[in-house]
Amino acid sequence: MALNDFHVSEPYTLGIELEMQVINPPSYDLSQDSSTLIDAVKSRLTAGEIKHDITESMLEMATGVCRDIDQAAAQLSAMQHVILQAASEHHLGICGGGTHPFQKWQRQEVCDNERYQRTLENFGYLIQQATVFGQHVHVGCANGDDAIYLLHGLSHFVPHFIALSAASPYMQGSDTRFACARLNIFSAFPDNGPMPWVSNWQEFAGLFRRLSYTTMIDSIKDLHWDIRPSPAFGTVEVRVMDTPLTLDHAINMAGLIQATAHWLLTERPFKPQEQDYLLYKFNRFQACRYGLEGVLTDAYTGDRRRLADDTLRLLDNVTPSARKLGADSAIDALRLQVKKGGNEAQYMREFIADGGSLIGLVQKHCEIWAGQ
């Protein structure tokens, strides 16, 4: 199968996708009513898109192409208002978080959609288990070769993005001991983790052609890599973040990725090499397991450093780019988060340690998303 040409887009433009939990009070389990909710909101939207994602307990909010985080925030805020209004009318709740803390995957209904039904046929129960919730950020690129360079550059910071956004410590009623348990769900997929090594767009087109021989890949959307190029949009898509509990944090994460992309493409601080990925999965695991307390290991020198410290260094490096893009508020907020030493997974555990229940935790998450 031939790959589409890379669509030229304005560099550093943004698109944000948020996979939201549709909740059924008073049990605060996942609902199976996303279709009802989506039908109720479609006519009310003025910008962006609201659509299905895998199962009937998931709802995806997606912005259009945005020039900066302020425009993205305005679109997401408008969608949030419409969704919350419709959810209230249908006695449903909406919240973020990378996993629902006590839902049972066996109860999840895959959407009546040709693509998702085909995916269910290919992957079986793994698709129902993939009822987890992430934030994806698209960044515009001028051409395919820039997209491949950007993908490799951003891959250096996958642990940082995971640790900052980690919000999935609980699954199936248990504390997983992970800050981000969501990404473990995809470990059984044949395309889990980093994209196979290529050095330019021509090589990527050849890779995609060979992957299509498996009969499991019909489009880029069928690839579950941590970061992937999206030629139809002319973007690189970062896919490792848990959906945050607040819109503000989602915007901050998008601002960081946009600023990092600008820094990478203007400064070119790395010469991508295949060996860069030698310890990729080990460092990724550290971020998932321990969050900002994880330890990164340099694939070349063996040097080890705290993820929190390296994240502060990243934030310092991208600050000039953030100022140019109007994303400096995002960098400031994330710097404060790192210095305080926490993420949303830590907040969730503190809620339970203070005597809260998992049902109460989901209720609290719905209240947080609704701004209560």
UniProtKB/Swiss-Prot annotation:
It catalyses: L-cysteine + L-glutamate + ATP = gamma-L-glutamyl-L-cysteine + ADP + phosphate + H(+). GO terms for biological process: modified amino acid biosynthetic process. Homodimer. It holds the Pfam family GCS2. The keyword rRNA-binding does not apply. ATP-dependent carboxylate-amine ligase which exhibits weak glutamate--cysteine ligase activity. This is Putative glutamate--cysteine ligase 2. Its EC number is 6.3.2.2. The keyword ATP-binding applies. GO terms for molecular function: ATP binding; glutamate-cysteine ligase activity. Keywords: ATP-binding, Ligase, Nucleotide-binding. Belongs to the glutamate--cysteine ligase type 2 family. YbdK subfamily. It is an enzyme of class 6 (ligase). InterPro entries: GCL_type2/YbdK_subfam (IPR050141), GCS2 (IPR006336), Gln_synth/guanido_kin_cat_dom (IPR014746), YbdK (IPR011793).
